[in-house]
């Protein structure tokens, strides 16, 4: 029997006394959460933001985890000093790790452990603190904020202001729950609209004190406090664009020194709107269909399928990396599609009868009906197609991304959250049309679709890591930024010795939040509202 998710848990992470691996500055730490539910294989769940020049980081990124009462969920928090833009951790300095179970964190509410190196020895005096909260409230607060004339802390320029939000815990301490972006060189900063869950902000208590701090960002990590104010949600939600709520930013040290001190700037709240966000299950139970499409790389770099060295070579027991990846991901996602009819395409091969190179040919060779019956149907189409084509090139992703995007664009015209598209591309990794693919992904980020890329073989996957926006927003060649991160890349060989469900768990981990993120952004509700249905019963 499958484990039932009891609840969702939010984990906040901070570290103290980290090892300093940088010469002339301090480490730039980032925390990675790994999960293990069976065997020896750990898989990455998510990463915090990177904090520059800091040995005592408080990460604002919150890890959201499903808590299964009857499953021992082993967690590993790895801390790394990030000095480059690659997604790989092997080329970053390791600052220490901590292993525990989710049950231990939940029962402690706050767990502090020493960080240890891979050999089990202490990572200097480094420690990690993990705080856990159950998420019961799906209300979120949408903010629009700006400031006027915050104190100028920079000698040769203007301040680089950012805000931090803190809530007060039951033991009286302050816990940071959100950090805005830095607005560079600006004494009248306008921050991008942002949202914070009401539970994270104030435990859902409208009269709970919230502390907001304004800082001037410094590259060396010694951020200067401009000022602070305290308020409550009751006060904040009075704000509107017509009538903003304003707060004086007070720096206590300056106030005590100067009798004429007035303030260190004014923070203006232009919008503070509470809204209820549907969960992934609300959408699925409310009738939203996940439409699954497969794209398979048939380029010459895979080698001749008849050769045992080829990535398309089907072994005597009937498998290869392409088929294993397809089964692993497809078996999970097919449960969310009612008719289980999936379009499957190949790209990069010469196809009969003219032997022209095609970058989006149906694997069943039926252009008017490229649908296959379930994952088994896709596997059969793949096996049948392989001996009929000539592997060629180049490796172009953009045609198949644009193909799915056309269907997603049509679905985007609907007034409810009825359809979401997931494209699985399985490739050996040497991409040719990088600029066109970047543009296609940026365009698709505005549509109800996500892209999963599974890299098979041992090729250079640096281009794939570039497309996965985890290191920062992907940009088109013209500089246009993707409004959502919709690409998830995973190298297949990372999971070769893992339980068969591990690959699917990893590549599908971001899909629920991408689905929710899209529909909530456009304020689309499920076709059938589950809450309404329950009330009628």
From Swiss-Prot:
The record's subcellular location field reads: Nucleus; Cytoplasm; Cell membrane; Cell junction
> What cofactor requirement does the entry state?
Ca(2+)
Q: Which residues form the C2 domain?
A: 1-115, 124-247
According to the UniProt record, list the residues that bear Phosphoserine: 14, 197, 243
Which residues does the UniProt record annotate as the domain VWFA? Answer: 291-513
Positions of Ca(2+) 3 binding: 154, 160, 216, 218
Asked if Repeat is a keyword of the record, the answer is: yes
Positions of Ca(2+) 1 binding:
22, 28, 81, 83
Residues that bind Ca(2+) 2, according to the entry?
Answer: 22, 81, 83, 93
Query: Which modifications occur after translation, per UniProt?
Result: Phosphorylated on serine and threonine residues.
Domain of life assignment: Eukaryota
Q: Per its record, what are the GO molecular function terms?
A: calcium-dependent phospholipid binding; calcium-dependent protein binding; metal ion binding; receptor tyrosine kinase binding
The record's section on PROSITE patterns has: C2
Return the GO cellular component terms, semicolon-separated. Answer: cell junction; cytoplasm; focal adhesion; nucleus; plasma membrane
Q: How does it assemble?
A: Monomer. Interacts with ERBB2 (preferentially with the tyrosine phosphorylated form); this interaction occurs at the cell membrane and is increased in a growth factor heregulin-dependent manner. Interacts with SHC1; this interaction may mediate the binding of CPNE3 with ERBB2. Interacts with RACK1.
Regarding protein family, the annotation reads:
Belongs to the copine family.
Q: What does this protein do?
A: Calcium-dependent phospholipid-binding protein that plays a role in ERBB2-mediated tumor cell migration in response to growth factor heregulin stimulation.
List the protein's name.
Copine-3
The taxonomy runs:
Eukaryota, Metazoa, Chordata, Craniata, Vertebrata
């Amino acid at each position: 029997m499958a484990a039932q998710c009891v609840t969702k848990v939010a984990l906040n992470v901070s570290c103290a006394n980290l090892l300093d691996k940088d010469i002339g500055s301090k480490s730039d730490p980032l925390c990675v959460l790994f999960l293990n539910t069976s065997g020896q294989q750990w898989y990455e769940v998510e990463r915090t933001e990177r904090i520059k020049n800091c040995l005592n980081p408080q990460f604002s990124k919150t890890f959201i985890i499903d808590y299964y009462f009857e499953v021992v969920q082993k967690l590993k928090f790895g801390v790394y000093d990030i000095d480059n833009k690659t997604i790989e951790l092997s080329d970053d300095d390791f600052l220490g790790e901590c292993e525990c179970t989710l049950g231990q964190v939940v029962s402690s509410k706050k767990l502090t452990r020493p960080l240890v190196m891979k050999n089990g020895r202490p990572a200097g005096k480094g420690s990690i603190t993990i705080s856990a909260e159950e998420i019961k409230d799906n209300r979120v607060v949408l903010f629009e904020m700006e400031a006027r004339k915050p104190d100028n802390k920079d000698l040769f320029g203007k301040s680089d202001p950012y805000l931090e939000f803190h809530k007060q815990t039951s033991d009286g301490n302050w816990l940071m729950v959100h950090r805005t972006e830095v607005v560079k060189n600006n004494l009248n900063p306008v921050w991008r609209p942002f949202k914070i869950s009401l539970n994270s902000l104030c435990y859902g208590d409208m009269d709970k004190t919230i502390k907001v701090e304004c800082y001037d960002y410094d590259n060396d990590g010694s951020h200067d406090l401009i000022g602070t104010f305290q308020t409550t949600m009751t006060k904040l939600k009075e704000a509107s664009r017509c009538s903003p709520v304003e707060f004086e930013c007070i720096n206590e040290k300056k106030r005590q020194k100067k009798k004429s001190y007035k303030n260190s700037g004014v923070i203006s709240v232009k919008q503070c709107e509470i809204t209820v966000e549907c969960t992934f299950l609300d959408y699925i139970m409310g009738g939203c269909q996940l439409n699954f499409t497969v794209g398979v790389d048939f380029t010459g770099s895979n080698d001749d399928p008849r050769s045992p060295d080829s990535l398309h070579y089907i072994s005597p027991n009937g498998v290869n990396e392409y088929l294993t990846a397809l089964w692993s991901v497809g078996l999970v996602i097919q449960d969310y599609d009612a008719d289980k009819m999936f379009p499957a395409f190949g790209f990069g091969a010469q196809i009969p009868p003219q032997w022209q190179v095609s970058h989006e040919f149906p694997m069943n060779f039926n252009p008017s009906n490229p649908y296959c019956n379930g994952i088994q149907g896709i596997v059969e189409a793949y096996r049948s197609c392989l001996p009929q084509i000539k592997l060629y090139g180049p490796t172009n992703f953009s045609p198949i991304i644009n193909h799915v995007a056309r269907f997603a664009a049509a679905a985007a015209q609907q007034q409810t959250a009825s359809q979401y598209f997931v494209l699985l591309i399985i490739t050996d990794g040497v991409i040719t049309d990088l600029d066109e693919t970047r543009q296609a992904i940026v365009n698709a980020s505005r549509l109800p679709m996500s892209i999963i890329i599974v890299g098979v073989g041992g090729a250079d996957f640096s281009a794939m890591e570039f497309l996965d926006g985890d290191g920062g927003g992907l940009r088109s060649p013209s500089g246009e930024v993707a409004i959502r991160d919709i690409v998830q890349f995973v190298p297949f060989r990372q999971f070769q010795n893992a339980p068969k469900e591990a690959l699917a768990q990893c590549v599908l981990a971001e899909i629920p939040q991408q689905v929710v993120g899209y529909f909530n952004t456009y304020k689309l509700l499920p076709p059938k509202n589950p809450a309404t249905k329950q009330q009628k019963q």
